[in-house]
């Protein structure tokens, strides 16, 4: 990883206003597919720009910023999807976000292919737990349909 880029990310200043948070999230959203549970991690930052309240940077926002910076500067190796390998889809839901990881089994080891993470709409946050979990499965199946329908083996959920 290019050390000048790593330094630029690590030196990213604490946002002083909503515009600064939007700027950071704009860059962060590009890499969301490489970060497990991105929506949960970034939630405090999104809450800050969505609220009609005065800008107030607190511990949850700082933790989210620091966690995202750490993820951006840590090399995570995703593998290419191989339709000859067995796929595994793992999903989860929290009170406000859904997420999933698609993996393949190579040489007896599961390797991540992609991550998915989305914030739930306000009405979806009212769903019962089982419905939230099913929503995460449906969203993941829709997102990775092109891999799973072409797979030569059955896939696991």
Enumerate the language-model features and the residues they cover.
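Metal-dependent nuclease catalytic cores in nucleic-acid-processing enzymes
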Residues: 28-31, 133-151
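Short amphipathic alpha-helical interface segments
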Residues: 83-86, 110, 149-155
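C-terminal reverse transcriptase regions that engage the nucleic-acid substrate
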Residues: 1-85
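Substrate-binding beta-hairpin/strand module that engages nucleic acids
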Residues: 40-48, 146-157
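A short, polar/acidic, helix/strand-boundary loop motif
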Residues: 106-135, 139, 152
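Conserved beta-strand/loop block within the catalytic cores
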Residues: 76, 83-105
């Amino acid at each position: 990883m290019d050390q000048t880029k790593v330094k630029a990310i690590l030196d990213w200043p604490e946002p002083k206003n909503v515009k600064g948070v939007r700027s950071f999230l704009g860059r962060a959203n590009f890499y969301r597919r490489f970060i497990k549970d991105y929506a949960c991690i970034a939630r405090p930052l999104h809450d800050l720009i969505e609220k009609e309240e005065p800008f107030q940077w607190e511990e949850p926002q700082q933790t989210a910023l620091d966690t995202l910076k750490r993820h951006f500067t840590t090399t995570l190796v995703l593998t290419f999807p191989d339709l000859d390998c067995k796929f595994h889809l793992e999903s989860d839901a929290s009170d406000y976000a859904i997420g999933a990881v698609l993996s393949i089994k190579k040489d007896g080891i599961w390797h991540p292919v992609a991550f998915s993470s989305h914030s739930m709409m306000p009405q979806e946050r009212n769903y019962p737990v089982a419905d939230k979990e099913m929503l995460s499965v449906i969203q993941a199946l829709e997102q990775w349909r092109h891999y799973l329908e072409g797979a030569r083996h059955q896939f696991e959920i």
